[in-house]
Amino acid sequence: MLRLFRFTLFMIILLMIMLPQTGFARGGSGYAVLDGETGRILIGSNSDARLPIASLTKIWTALVAIENSDLQDEVVISSKAAMSEGSSIYLQAGETVTVETLLYGLMLRSGNDAATALAEHVGGSVEGFVKLMNERAVIAGLTNTVFMNPSGLHHEEHLSSARDTAEMLRIALQNKTFEKIASTVLYRADTVNGMLWENKHRLLREGSGMAADIDDETEQPVSSLKSATGTAFAGKTGFTKVAGRTLA
């Protein structure tokens, strides 16, 4: 019974949506729901349209990093990583952080600095890592996907589709390390600032009962590390002005 319930959840979270402000799956938007075991598309609209996916990119960034590094590898944060544009986990140039911590910062807080640091460590450079991402996408059969960076910041050629993005998550969740990280709601970082990170994915927080556990003064989560157990157990959110809001 538990296995059936988990499989049902698996299918639900394999929904990827790009919603404009005024409608559902119109114009530059699309969605897809896949069978969690076979990858067969169950329902969708504009599911093969090539669109910007924002930080859903980080699903693939995380998987490629996990497959090509050790979680306990130590990464010295470069100035380039620390100064990355967009969302951040506030890494400081020169500090040393494990790959594992960077992965949690990537998936829970969508840190672009974490994405850059992982890319430099695993690929030797951001460009080298992006090459690995695209090679892995070809192996996975993601025919509508091209990556230009590891964070999902807007680039005209950085595109995927709802079907491909759902497939990214389906494939990534077959990796136990990824599943553990992507389903974590709270994580205490071993960075210089030592913050307690809460997953930005609202469905995960609400499912675990953690949505309201925030200190009003510090705006920081007050509970210990916890994994999602509700209607969604893993996923990723994203946003750019061009892509709009994205969800997996």
Each language-model region and where it sits:
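Extended hydrophobic/Leu-rich segments
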Residues: 9-11, 94, 225
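Bacterial N-terminal signal peptides that target proteins for export
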Residues: 1-9
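Bacterial N-terminal signal peptides
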Residues: 8-19
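Protein maturation boundaries and topogenic segments
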Residues: 3, 21-22
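Penicillin-recognizing serine hydrolase domain
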Residues: 26-30, 125-248
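N-terminal start-of-chain detector that recognizes signal peptides
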Residues: 5, 47-49, 76-78, 218-223, ...
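Active-site-adjacent loops and short helices of periplasmic peptidoglycan-processing enzymes
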Residues: 23-163, 167-176
